[in-house]
Amino acid sequence: MSLLLAQAAVNDANIHFDKLYSYRIPAELAGRVFPGSMVLVPFGRGSKARMAVVLAVGEVDESDAPKGLKTLYDAAPEDARLTPDLLELVRFLKERTFCTWFEAVKAVIPYGAQYRPAVVDGRHVMQSRLTRSTERLYTLAGALPEKPKPGPRQLAAVAALQNGPLTARQLDEVGISRATLDGLVKKGVLTAAEQDKAIDLFAAIPFDPQPLELSPEQQQAFNDLLPNLEDARPHAALLHGVTGSGKTIVFLRLIQRTLELGRRALVLVPEISLTPQMIRRLKSTFGSRLAVQHSALNNTERLLQWRMIQQGNADIVVGTRSAVFAPLQNLGLIIMDEEQEHTYQSESAPRFDAHDVAKKRAVMENALLLFASATPLTETYHAAESGKLQLVQLTHRYGGRPLPSVDFIDMRAELAAGNPREVSVRLARELQENLDNGEQSILLLNRRGYRTIGMCTTCGHVLKCPNCSVPLVYHKPQQALLSHHCGHTVHPLPQTCPECGGKISYSGFGTQRVEEELAELLPGARILRMDQDSTSRKDAHETMLAQFARHEYDILLGTQMVAKGLDFEKVTLVGVLGIDSLLFGQGFRAYESVFSLITQVVGRGGRAALPGRALIQTSVPDHPVLQLAAAQDYKGFYREEITFRRFSLYPPFCSFVVVGFIGDQEGAVFIAAQRFGALLGQHAAQKPNIPLRILGPAPMNITMLNNKFRYKLTLKCRNDAAFRALLHETLDAYDAEKLPQKASVILDFNSDGDL
């Protein structure tokens, strides 16, 4: 006699128990359990109910069945099953990031689509984490009987449904009650079914398609990309265009052609702040078969959008990093806009890079993957130069508009002249000029808060978070010190030193402080501050950007969320403040990040008929990175950067992997990192064909976070299957070590040098 078995990965299993377990499928579940099914299983001592995902199903002779075989408790409905494509992405994440099976599962499906264990009438069952919001859909199924004579409401209902199914809500709006409809169902005139309640997130955006008129250069870019879009094989390309060159209209034309081919499109953006403008362009051009996926949606909205995609009711999906897992079928085009942004990398398990997942999906779907940026990653441009990606260029601004002129303001001279403010005299003057002319300005300061450091004037003690090794930041509206890493709050604001009783002086500046200065310097100016603090409310990004577009504000002051992708025709002045701290930041990408940030924000100016200009405040105006960014000279920067990367052995000439160690005792964490490094070296010595350099152990940039000490090993390697197998061997050997205190191990395969 044969048994039907499921191989399942169990939720909440730690890394040592994260493997596939065999379970018997009972007869009552035989037709409901398949690869990708979410199931409820007994696990461990006491057979505690746990969620699991099925990876494989097969038959085995009863005599060959594993001893102690347990039986599945329950299985989720079919619509909760992971498609084969999503299941393949789960396997990909598990293999590439060393996460657990269920960490990968939770990455590819939204919270609302997940289930939890419950007990009903003494039985272990699965319950949805969200109450499903449904509505009744009525469909015409037959003719009205002549007798008894139908009433006017019944006739109206049948007439309304002649053109297709309608919901109870839609019919109620024209005066047809639920009682009338249910009466017609009983007569067999209508059929009724429950469907997910529709939420039109874009109802306020009209469908107003305009001709997609391309410039000759844009048309050439489209023509160059078209053969790979129409080819039924996977392809990848880089669209490198200067700021304002009109990359978006090329996107729209490619999406239009994708839909004509009967396929679907996925558009990724790095920031939630960029989704409103992209959604507006897509909805107005292509209509309502559009879905969105990002973290600003509540759980219900995200689930309904996900189900809309899953059920094939969306042709285009736009969203941030997590949208790369959208369950689109027949995917023909993936666009990754502003592909250089670090936000495409996840900072929690599974620590994936959306670039890698997008490449995997393009191969799985035989799709075109298009990276796009004015300042692409050095690795991406190198791949294009090397012929691994198709390189398509847009070298001119749309409409022949010039790039903004750029000047530097030497803040050393400002200080010497007696200006104590963070806003220079010239920047204030030019902001006033814009106000007088009815034009708008954007100011970038990538530092939130009011004051960034509190220090004792007597002993020099710096006020730091007790849970983290970072200074606390003064936030004036709350009159409190906040940790931007763990959220620790100190209130009321300390005025005396906890070490010696001396006076605390607050210095440094953030967006709140500059907002206050601008109000003092420019009375009557309407200033909109856009940072993590001011955009915490739902729909805040969309609301603020719409207000600025309507010229309800004169100055947009913000962090990096205002630096890229935004297009406002009245913005003619861009100011950059506080860039020096980023220029001398840690990590091998510091120069690349600064070049990109300045190039992008400068490109926000002069995008319509009015010419643009930019002012960069710095104490190092002659720095070559700033000079190249001011000139919008990406190729010049790339030549310098690729030379540095080659000489120093940084990506793309190697992979850069960080192994992090986290624990309660600093000494124990250091010893754990040291021992892991020794074990890795020993195993690597037996495999001389695997290139590897081990650096460290060393403290991470933030040595303590959430009361945990943090050390790291940095590995320069070739991240292939052989290297990952070596890491697995080392992890197994480390787990077998008898250390007095072990540290948690975290791996990041996409690091710039820290976690």
Where would I find each of the regions flagged by the language model?
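Inter-lobe coupling/hinge segments of SF2-like helicase ATPases
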Residues: P209-S215, Q219, A232-F670, Q682, ...
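Long hydrophobic segments that form regular secondary structure
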Residues: Q674-F676
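A general secondary-structure signal for short beta-strands and their flanking turns/coil
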Residues: L3-L5, D18, S47, G438, ...
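Solvent-exposed, membrane-proximal periplasmic/extracellular interface segments of envelope transport
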Residues: D64-A75, A698-M700, M704-K716
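A carboxyl-terminal module marker
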Residues: A678, Q682-L705, F709, V745-L755
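Accessory, non-ATPase domains that flank or precede helicase/AAA+ motor cores in DNA-metabolism machines
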Residues: M1-L370, T380, E385-R401, H683, ...
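Short secondary-structure junctions
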Residues: N14, L522-A525, L680-R693, E737-K742
